[in-house]
Amino acid sequence: MKKLYDQYERLHDYVRISITDRCNLRCVYCMPKEGLPFFPTDRVLSQDEIVQLITNFAQLGVHKVRITGGEPLLRTDVVDIVRRIKEIDGIEDVSITTNGLFLAKKAKALKEAGLDRLNISLDTFKPEVYKEITRGGNINQVLDGIATASALHFKKIKLNIVLIRGQNDDELLDFINYTKDHDVNVRFIEFMPIGNSLEEWKQEYVALDSVFDLCKQAGLDYHPIDLAGNGPSDNYQVEGYTGSFGLIHPISSKFCENCNRLRITADGYIKACLYWNEEINVRKLIYDFDAFKAGVQRALDNKPLNHEMAMKTTDRIIDKAPTWRHMSQIGG
């Protein structure tokens, strides 16, 4: 089996595939408040195209798949997509990133279809702040979804928290203490300038350095732990707590040297790097395996060693222009 390596000898065995650009929220770090019309239905990958894409990737050594959006649970066929992907020979792990609003209704069917893991976006515990960040969301639906999913015993549930200055950076300890009685991995993620102006990003960016200081001030004894997989999160557990917390810092501490992932947009383009404008249309190649393989390899051959979110060493400010797609159009 030919496996997927880039020019820096990084093995790529993980695909993140967006199955829709549509979302029922407009989170401030993902979409603009207005505009950004959704793709017409025929521009979005069909269920059969998604399954064929992943089948091709499995023949190239990919064994891990994450389904993203937009909001993937908006697709009425999402359970069938999960089931069919999980049935592909070579695919060992299937997960979904969701805002959780429909999770209470769909978690059981997803588990029965073979879904292994869940990442749920929850940027705050405060209802009004949640409504502000998401531009209208109801946090109680998310909390119900988390409770439902927890009772079903997925392999792992992770909560994604994008830190935004002045909005949720005062809740760090609340999230860490949530792991005392909840078997989840809370992940703090640095706000990235994707689809945002650099000036706006500069005002809202929060580095993760303060997490350890807050833990020490609160008298929390924490230690590093290893979680399954080779993702970008540095993980820790407070002594005596059930769950854990992780730090994902794409800005202040790059993890590019171990990158093993490829992204497929909802309209069928491959992005070898989240913050890299180059894209290759692989949708038109999916039923010609040799052409597909060549297209994927071409994307890998052009993959940069590091992303373009390069920091100036003096003032920690990005000095590169952001990618042209918004996050909802790439796949979170």
Curated annotation (Swiss-Prot):
Lineage, top-rank taxon, reads Bacteria
Q: What pathway, per the record?
A: Cofactor biosynthesis; molybdopterin biosynthesis
Q: Which Pfam families match?
A: Fer4_12 (PF13353), Mob_synth_C (PF06463), Radical_SAM (PF04055)
Q: Does the keyword section mention Kinase? A: no
Keywords from UniProt, A to Z, are: 4Fe-4S, GTP-binding, Iron, Iron-sulfur, Lyase, Metal-binding, Molybdenum cofactor biosynthesis, Nucleotide-binding, S-adenosyl-L-methionine
**InterPro entries reported for this sequence:** Aldolase_TIM, Elp3/MiaA/NifB-like_rSAM, MoaA, MoaA_NifB_PqqE_Fe-S-bd_CS, MoaA_twitch, MoCo_biosynth_MoaA/MoaC, rSAM
| Ranges of residues in domain Radical SAM core | 7-221
Q: What is this protein called?
A: GTP 3',8-cyclase
Protein's organism: Limosilactobacillus fermentum (strain NBRC 3956 / LMG 18251) (Lactobacillus fermentum)
